[in-house]
Curated annotation (Swiss-Prot):
Family: Belongs to the XseA family.
GO cellular component: a single term: exodeoxyribonuclease VII complex
Gene: xseA
UniProt subcellular location: Cytoplasm
Lineage: Bacteria, Pseudomonadati, Pseudomonadota, Gammaproteobacteria, Enterobacterales
GO biological process, one term: DNA catabolic process
NCBIfam families given in the database record: xseA (TIGR00237)
Name of one Pfam family that matches: tRNA_anti_2
InterPro entries linked to this entry: Exonuc_VII_L, Exonuc_VII_lsu_C, OB-fold_nuc-bd_dom
Protein name as catalogued: Exodeoxyribonuclease 7 large subunit
Enzyme Commission number: 3.1.11.6
Record CDD domains: ExoVII_LU_OBF
Length: 457
């Protein structure tokens, strides 16, 4: 039996779980550089590969929701920099890392340093807005810290010459690329502050790769810009290039040319502003003089209006106007009375019954005439229709047929005889003629011979 002093006994599951927790809690998230091998991507979309160097290797997994953010396709033998969590796959006891992000090793290392320095300086408050110094407006002298042979200096001088040719420019030439560049940039910033020759500084260079721009991601340069008593405008690379110097400077310009635009005044614009100001001043003076002239004219007119003769004339004018209004009112009143009288007379005439009686009699006569005409027309139409009916009836009447020499013979039972086979010898029959009836007895029957119909040829 085991004694009470025996060490704790782990099951395999508990051991793997404890090791996993220890790895995840103690190691946390780390950056790892290595070479990719055995890269696979099953249908799940996850990536599985081995990360190795000359002496060791480790299994890696990068799940689909993480690898979809990778901007390149990992290749066998490629050097990469990954950010990952250390863990243990408990069922098999395999030690592995779970990759969260992946970058190519060259720029990836620089990017990591960039992010670390950015976080450090931000935590110290070097990027805070409260420390940003305002740019002079207008600037009386501009200092430029850049390479004396680079395109950035040419662009800056070209813009300054175009916008403000009289603005003094002091160039502090430095290297902007290489191991010595950060130190030279720092010394140039310190020199400009020591001389007090200019009231704004442009620090920058033209575009390039991350390595080319790395001098402006140097901590020494960032702290020198922050410590500068002269406001600093950063102008590094193109608009898409963002460096530590951009965050710590008092203002970031997307390009060197834009920085020159920021620190200079457009003399042509100033000339237009002066011309506009002069025009506004002339307009204000014209308005002032016109206003004073109008006021003088008003006072002069009022003075003339106070003359006694003018007042008397105005009173006479008012009196004449009142007289005209009174005559007009009397005429209108008289017209209204006459008009009212005419309307009353017209209404009275309209109430007289004689015109109504006359109109009613006339209406009755018209109706009587129309009634008589309608009766005559209807009687004529009825007579015509009756005559047509009689003519039609006579045309189809059997009596008319009898009058033409035909007759109708009937048996004793009243049936009309049409064929000889309906009677026999000794039968009585009655014949209807046009003017009466004849009764006779059948003595003999002789059928008529049938005529043959000719066949068509």
């Amino acid at each position: 039996m085991l004694s009470s002093q025996s060490p704790s006994i782990y099951t395999v599951s508990r051991l793997n779980q404890s090791v996993r927790l220890l790895l995840e809690q103690e190691m946390g998230q780390v950056w790892i550089s290595g070479e990719i091998s055995n890269f696979t991507q099953p249908s799940s979309g996850h990536w599985y590969f081995t990360l190795k160097d000359d002496n060791a290797q480790v299994r890696c997994a990068m799940f689909r929701n993480s690898n979809r953010r990778v901007t390149f396709r990992p290749q066998h033998g490629q050097q990469v920099l990954v950010r990952a969590n250390i863990t243990l796959y408990e069922p098999r006891g395999d030690y592995q890392i779970i990759v969260e992000s992946m970058q190519p090793a060259g720029e990836g290392l620089l990017q990591q340093k960039y992010e670390q320095l950015k976080a450090k300086l931000s935590a110290e408050g070097l990027f805070d807005q409260q420390f940003k110094k305002p740019l002079p407006s207008p600037a009386h002298c501009v200092g430029v810290i850049t390479s004396k042979t680079g395109a950035a200096l040419h662009d800056i001088l070209h813009v300054l010459k175009r916008r403000d040719p009289s603005l003094p420019v002091i160039i502090y030439p430095t290297a902007v690329q290489g191991d010595d560049a950060p130190g030279q940039i720092v010394r140039a910033i310190e020199l400009a502050n020591a001389r007090h020759e200019c009231d704004v500084l442009i620090v920058g260079r033209g575009g390039g790769s991350l390595e080319d721009l790395w001098s402006f991601n140097d901590e020494r340069v960032a702290r020198a810009i922050f410590a500068s008593q002269i406001p600093v405008v950063s102008a590094v690379g193109h608009e898409t290039d963002v460096t530590i110097a951009d965050f710590v400077s008092d203002m970031r310009a997307p390009t060197p040319s834009a920085a020159a635009e920021v620190v200079s005044r457009n003399q042509q614009e100033l000339l237009r502003q002066m011309q506009n100001g002069q025009q506004r001043l002339e307009m204000a003076m014209d308005y002032f003089l016109a206003n004073r002239t109008r006021r003088f004219t008003q006072l002069h007119h009022r003075l003339q209006q106070q003359h006694p003769q003018l007042r008397l004339e105005r009173q006479q004018t008012v009196l004449e106007r009142l007289r005209q209004r009174m005559n007009f009112a009397l005429d209108n009143q008289l017209k209204r009375v006459v008009s009212h009288q005419q309307r009353m007379t017209q209404r009275l005439n309209q109430q007289n019954p004689q015109p109504k009686i006359y109109r009613t009699q006339t209406r009755i006569q018209q109706l009587e005439y129309r009634l008589a005409e309608n009766l005559r027309a209807r009687l004529s139409t009825t007579r015509e229709r009756f005559g047509n009916a009689v003519t039609h009836l006579e045309a189809v009447s059997p009596l008319s047929t009898l009058a033409r020499g035909y007759s109708v013979t009937t048996a004793t039972d009243g049936k009309v005889l049409k064929q000889t086979k309906q009677v026999k010898a000794g039968d009585l029959m009655t014949t209807r003629l046009a003017d009466g009836w004849v009764e006779s007895e059948v003595k003999g029957i002789t059928p008529a011979k049938k005529t043959r119909k000719k066949k068509p040829v």
